[in-house]
Amino acid sequence: MVKSHIGSWILVLFVAMWSDVALCKKRPKPGGGWNTGGSRYPGQGSPGGNRYPPQEGGDWGQPHGGGWGQPHVGGWGQPHGGGWGQPHGGGGWGQGGTHGQWNKPSKPKTNMKHVAGAAAAGAVVGGLGGYMLGSAMSRPLIHFGSDYEDRYYRENMYRYPNQVYYRPVDQYSNQNNFVHDCVNITVKQHTVTTTTKGENFTETDIKMMERVVEQMCITQYQRESEAYYQRGASVILFSSPPVILLISFLIFLIVG
């Protein structure tokens, strides 16, 4: 009988202590943040009061108006108005300007070359009537059948395009039509653009350029065809009734 009473009292005491600890954790701490009325330093007479009495014409510790420790108008520690540590008016710390300019982050500068290049590329593609500009490629290593042509190509390959113009693959019935159109528009556009800059191409240049661009157009067709079929497979997959039913069920579980 005595043991049961002792056990009950121990249980009650444990519950009371647990409740008190929980309340203490939820209870907000007295006082406030910085400068909310409480004293940060010992020896102050009244709560919320200043350690030193205010003097005429200023805030706490200001003999002549201004920030703390200012004999004249200005920022903290400014004898004549200016940035911190500045003997005379002017800029932020170490330079001209106001006190508020100390830590202003500098605005990122826009690279005007990139903007101009992007705008020019967009104008060219838009002016070609629906053609798109492919990504840059490495110029292929091609053998033309003679040592002279092979050497000429290695020495002048940088003058030939490394990007091709093309239309979506679904507008063509086969690869040959895509490549033929891609080669014609790319060689024509590159020739006109380069000739405008004062550089001319010989017949050998045109011959080599067509071979190089043909290889790049074939590569571009393979990339676009693969991406096109992948998009089509994704559409078919997500439009099938079982997948639609599964997605609807998952949405119902999440919302419900």
Curated annotation (Swiss-Prot):
A lipid is attached at residue 233 (GPI-anchor amidated alanine). Residues 28-110 are annotated as: Disordered. One of its GO terms (biological process) is protein homooligomerization. Disulfide bonds join 182-217. Cu(2+) 4 binds at residues 88, 90-91. Monomer and homodimer. Has a tendency to aggregate into amyloid fibrils containing a cross-beta spine, formed by a steric zipper of superposed beta-strands. Soluble oligomers may represent an intermediate stage on the path to fibril formation. Copper binding may promote oligomerization. Interacts with GRB2, APP, ERI3/PRNPIP and SYN1. Mislocalized cytosolically exposed PrP interacts with MGRN1; this interaction alters MGRN1 subcellular location and causes lysosomal enlargement. Interacts with KIAA1191. This is Major prion protein 2. Sequence repeats lie at residues 54-62, 63-70, 71-78, 79-86, 87-95.
